[in-house]
């Protein structure tokens, strides 16, 4: 199947998209470097070891004030349209197309492969052609249990999501806000079936 034919999982409404902008999970209302230092302490408290970041600014801040993420998801732009240059592009690099307000089928598969590479000792970068925000969902769903996912909100919060079952279930609930036809596409995605969906 070519990239142009990959099904898209489209959030149904403004309300559904707005839910992803809420500071749920562990929200840190601080600017860097303070926000990163707090996240670091929480990582230690939760005994997390894998850092996954979603977003260019968060990825740069974590690398600057802590250490390089094991997995980062970036689109080389900020919300204001500023181009971000990442000098450390070594390691495994994936590219995926993901249009605004969508989740591509391919993003789940690439995220799973990315974590497999991380567990093999590689640093991984996923470069998104489009918008990376919603890839926080597969970043949580596909993450090993010792992972912490970090992403930023335009309201200024840094959000930390430990990859535990409770937060994975929350992400699955967000996915129920997809249109019916899109939910059928989602049901047929192997990565989501692994979390308990049954094909009908």
From Swiss-Prot:
Catalytic activity: 3'-dephospho-CoA + GTP = GDP + CoA + H(+)
Keyword set, alphabetical order: Coenzyme A biosynthesis, GTP-binding, Kinase, Nucleotide-binding, Transferase
UniProt keyword 4Fe-4S, yes or no: no
Pfam families referenced in this protein's UniProt entry, alphabetically: DUF359
Coiled-coil ranges (or none): none
GO biological process, one term: coenzyme A biosynthetic process
Domain of life the protein comes from: Archaea
Pathway note: Cofactor biosynthesis; coenzyme A biosynthesis
Sample GO molecular function, one term: GTP binding
The enzyme's E.C. designation: 2.7.1.237
Residues annotated for GTP binding in this entry: 56-58, 75, 132
Family: Belongs to the GTP-dependent DPCK family.
Function, in words: Catalyzes the GTP-dependent phosphorylation of the 3'-hydroxyl group of dephosphocoenzyme A to form coenzyme A (CoA).
Protein name: GTP-dependent dephospho-CoA kinase
Organism: Caldivirga maquilingensis (strain ATCC 700844 / DSM 13496 / JCM 10307 / IC-167)
